[in-house]
Design a protein with these regions (language model features):
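Terminal beta-strand-rich extracellular "head" domains
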Residues: 40-61
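Subunit-assembly interface segments of extracellular/virion macromolecular structures
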Residues: 15-43, 47, 87, 94-96
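Low-complexity intrinsically disordered segments
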Residues: 55-96
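Surface-exposed ligand/attachment interfaces on beta-rich extracellular proteins
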Residues: 1-21, 30-33, 58-60, 80-84
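Intrinsic-disorder/low-complexity regions
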Residues: 3, 51-52, 89
Length: 96
């Protein structure tokens, strides 16, 4: 995850026709700070609901959103300007 980005793609996409619910367990490391959490995303054609439950050592300056285009839901991120990029490690669970 690059520093100081707005709505940049994480590379994670979901076909709205076949995937309805997703849980993403993740870890973010940015500089000397770390964050561990779970994203829960409910997907419906052109709509979604997202929650982000996490703990972090200090503010990592990362937030998530979902966008829709052509039947695909895309997980995106925004980062603040801390001067450091962040690593994003994740495990995806599809719940249909």
């Amino acid at each position: 995850m690059a520093n100081n980005q707005t709505a940049a793609t994480t590379g994670l996409t979901f076909a709205e026709a076949s995937i309805k619910d997703v849980k993403i367990s993740y870890k973010i490391t940015r500089g000397s700070e770390s964050r561990v959490g779970t994203l829960a995303i409910a997907i419906k054609s052109g709509a979604h609901s997202i929650s982000d439950d996490y703990e972090e050592t200090a503010a990592t300056g990362v937030s998530f959103t979902v966008t829709h285009s052509g039947g695909i839901a895309t997980l995106k991120y925004t980062t603040t300007n801390t001067g450091a990029a962040a690593s994003f490690v994740n495990a995806i669970e599809i719940i249909n």
